[in-house]
């Protein structure tokens, strides 16, 4: 699968059946099944570097870091969405099950790929804002940059940081003293 595939107007139950046999990443957002190819080598290097830095930061703290593939189910009344972020930081442990997390992570990181840019920049940005993900990082391997969106007091995203590899560090608006060297991410 080289490009993202969308199947519209599917129920959550139909999605679960599709997911059982799907190759790559299979998400369910606003009634649409989104299937993506497995990530590239460069994507995985960046993901691994970020995971390593975050894992070190959260060692001995109450929050946990998870990397894809790990299902995050977002529920609002009868509305269900299931996403598989590249990285998520979960501080509220009450939503863990054996095979997924039901609830809202504090931080989600998505790494852009040619097949998913509009999906991560538009669809997921709106979804994560709607569900109250406190911080959303969008990583661009092509531009070697990271945009950090942070929820304001009214529940809307503002850009907290927009850094390139020429910047020394990227930091978090919600986790005190979390600073990651940009060169360590894109090495």
Regions found by a protein language model. Name each.
Residues 1-187:
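Gly/Pro/Ser/Thr-rich low-complexity, intrinsically disordered segments predominantly at protein N-termini
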């Amino acid at each position: 699968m080289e490009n993202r595939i969308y199947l519209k107007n599917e129920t959550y139950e139909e999605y679960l059946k599709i997911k059982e046999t799907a190759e790559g990443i299979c998400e369910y957002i606003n009634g649409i099944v989104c299937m993506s190819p497995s990530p590239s080598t460069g994507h995985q290097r960046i993901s691994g570097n970020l995971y390593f830095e975050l894992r070190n930061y959260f060692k001995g703290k109450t929050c946990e870091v998870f990397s894809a593939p790990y299902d995050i189910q977002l529920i609002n009344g009868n509305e269900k969405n299931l996403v598989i972020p590249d990285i998520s930081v979960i501080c509220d442990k009450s939503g863990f099950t054996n095979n997924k997390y039901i609830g809202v992570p504090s931080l989600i990181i998505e790494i852009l790929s040619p097949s998913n840019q509009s999906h991560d920049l538009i669809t997921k940005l709106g979804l994560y804002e709607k569900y109250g993900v406190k911080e959303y990082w969008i990583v661009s391997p092509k531009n070697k940059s990271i945009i950090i969106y942070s929820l304001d007091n009214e529940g809307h995203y503002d850009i907290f940081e927009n850094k390139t590899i020429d910047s020394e560090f990227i930091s978090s608006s919600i986790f005190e003293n979390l600073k990651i060297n940009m060169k360590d991410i894109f090495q």
